[in-house]
UniProtKB/Swiss-Prot annotation:
It catalyses: tRNA(Gln) + L-glutamine + ATP = L-glutaminyl-tRNA(Gln) + AMP + diphosphate. Disulfide bonds: none annotated. Keywords: Aminoacyl-tRNA synthetase, ATP-binding, Cytoplasm, Ligase, Nucleotide-binding, Protein biosynthesis. This is Glutamine--tRNA ligase. The gene is glnS. One of its GO terms (biological process) is glutaminyl-tRNA aminoacylation. Belongs to the class-I aminoacyl-tRNA synthetase family. L-glutamine binds at D68, Y213.
Length: 571
């Protein structure tokens, strides 16, 4: 896949950039990825990361990583570390050093003073609730604060008192003086600064007033020389304030903001607030639970950087909000793992088979391919003995004409091996089948049986070639396509989103994994034949108990001939 070519051909933002570069030959493309360090990155952030960094590469420009760290109440160093790790994991490197909006706090304070001196900002003492009430609605204009017409000198002095910590939290704020009757609610005297008494992870206790996102963002873009500030559609109205602040301060550089649709994924929730509810209620294990689309969760589930970037390329960049099929994301990783995953056999729900015509010392070795279509991936050895395991779902006691696997009185072929015939079953005290007694036809290795009818094939593992393992079978967390739109999204939790199985993998394969278990950065992927694609779960695995996460099943349901999306209002 030529990602750059795809971007250039399909991206409407490229048309804007091409026009800008043609009109100004001296212009260098300069963008940024500006996350708030208040949570973990998800698949929606990946779309923005890929867009900004790929555009910077395409136009031989630069892409900064800047943390918009203007709210110390919600921010944490652990999020900064996680975000940097995720960006590097995706294969991108930001320009120069990591930047922080907090590096510009003094300059931002000076810009705020400029607005006050121009009569374009004032210190207000209304509470949050009163500000919301005074703001009005889409149908009714707002009304002026009683503190709106203070003198410039009074506002200068009050803002300085805010900076010195003379007011308590919520007692005062700095607001832009624009138009309380504006058709755009965001322009109705928005708050520019508020008071927060808490230690900041970068500036410590130097500041107790903090700029709002809208004030800091545009000015940080200007300070860094950003040419194209790309954001999602929910910030479309914020552009009015973005441009107003730049126009009314003494900035020397004027970046331009452009909006594209955010990524909305079927059966998924991206809201940090809602994910936290799921965690607090113990519905999911944490921010890296493979049932949610954070990057750490997708990585744990077995998604690769290239599969995520391929997905972001396929969905493209538009101005229309759509609900993207989850099967498209699965298609991207399935297509990759089909080429790269080692083939091996695993038994998730074991049932024992005793081959009565083979003695207890019988042992035969088979050399099998690690990949049927790629000899360069090598081979591995499996052993065949008189006692083996098959999956419980591959046997049926009662006759069923439509059932094509092993049945009592019928035959089946073992993968890479012989045809066996089920003759008798043994049950435990609870009535569950504990053993299947079978006859092994040793004349059928690579040959048809005497009746010339080839039976179906099932996978198996010799009892002497097993290593116990846990298997986590993940499904969608929600049973409706758009849980984000539901007021009570908890009503739509899929109770079968995680099923745990305990069985076996091939011993030699397992022993190789155990040697690497201490290195969490090693990615190991398998196709468990006839089951699906799995990866090792380095978080839950121990040396004496391996845990595998199902990345995706074998069956592809996405129609690659067209990009299927649904209007976001549809469920």
């Amino acid at each position: 896949m030529d990602t750059k070519k795809e971007i250039k051909n399909n991206n409407f933002i490229c048309q804007i950039i091409n026009k800008d570069l043609n009109e100004n030959k001296n212009l260098s493309f300069y963008t940024r990825f500006p996350p708030e360090p208040n949570g973990y990155l998800h698949i929606g952030h990946a779309k923005s990361i890929c867009l900004n960094f790929e555009l910077a590469s395409l136009y031989k420009g630069r892409c900064n990583l800047r943390f918009d760290d203007t709210n110390p109440l919600k921010e944490n160093i652990k999020y900064i570390k996680s975000i940097k790790y995720d960006i590097n994991w995706l294969g991108y490197k930001w320009h120069g050093n990591v930047r922080y909006a907090s590096e510009y706090f003094l300059k931002l304070y000076q810009y705020a003073q400029e607005l006050i001196k121009k009569g374009l900002a004032y210190v207000d003492h209304l509470t949050k609730e009163q500000i919301r009430e005074y703001r009005g609605t889409l149908n009714t204009p707002g009304k002026n604060s009683p503190y709106r017409n203070r003198t410039i000198q009074e506002n200068i002095e009050l803002f300085e008192k805010m900076k010195k910590g003379d007011f308590s939290e919520g007692e005062a704020c700095l607001r832009a003086k624009i138009n309380m009757s504006s058709s755009s609610i965001i322009m109705r005297d928005p708050v520019l600064y508020r008071i927060i008494f808490i230690k900041h992870h970068q500036t410590q206790n130097k500041w107790c007033i903090y700029p709002m996102y809208d004030f800091a963002h545009c000015l940080s873009d200007s300070i860094e020389g950003i040419t194209h500030s790309l954001c999602t559609l929910e910030f479309q109205d914020n552009k009015f304030l973005y441009n107003w602040i730049l126009k009314n301060t003494s900035v020397k550089h004027y970046p331009k903001q452009y909006e594209f649709s955010r990524l909305n994924l079927e059966f998924s929730i991206l809201s940090k607030r809602k994910i936290k509810i799921l965690i607090d209620k113990n519905i999911i294990e944490g921010w890296d639970d493979p049932r949610i689309p954070t990057l750490s969760a997708l990585r744990r589930k077995g998604y690769t950087p290239s599969s995520i970037k391929n997905f972001c390329q396929k969905i493209g960049v538009t101005k229309q909000n759509n609900l993207i099929e989850f099967s498209m994301l699965e298609h991207c990783i399935r297509k990759e793992l089909n080429q790269t995953a080692i083939r091996t056999m695993a038994i998730l729900d074991p049932i024992k088979i005793f081959l009565y015509n083979l003695d207890s010392n019988y042992k035969e070795e088979f050399i099998v391919p690690n990949h049927p279509n790629n000899p360069e991936m090598g081979t591995h050895k499996i052993i065949f003995t008189n006692t083996i395991y098959i999956d419980r779902s591959d046997f049926k006691e009662k006759y069923d004409k439509k059932y094509k696997r092993l049945k009592l009185g019928e035959k089946i072929r073992l993968r890479y091996s012989y045809i066996i015939h089920a003759e008798k079953i043994e049950k435990d005290e609870y009535g569950n089948i504990s053993n299947i007694i079978c006859y092994c036809d040793l004349n059928t290795l690579g040959r048809k049986p005497k009746d010339n009818k080839n039976p179906a094939v099932i996978h198996w593992i010799s009892e002497k070639n097993t290593l116990s393992a846990e298997f986590k079978l993940y499904d969608q967390l929600f049973n409706i396509k758009n849980p984000e739109q539901q007021e009570n999204f908890l009503l739509y939790i899929n109770s079968k989103s995680l099923i745990k199985k305990f069985g076996f993998i091939e011993k030699k394969i397992g022993e190789e994994i155990q040697k690497k278990i201490s290195n969490n950065n090693i990615e190991i992927f398998f196709q468990f034949e006839r089951i699906g694609y799995f990866c090792i779960d380095f978080i839950d695995s121990k040396k004496n108990q391996l845990v595998f996460n199902r990345t995706v099943g074998l069956r592809d349901t996405w129609d690659s001939k067209k990009i299927k999306t649904k209007n976001i209002t549809n469920n």
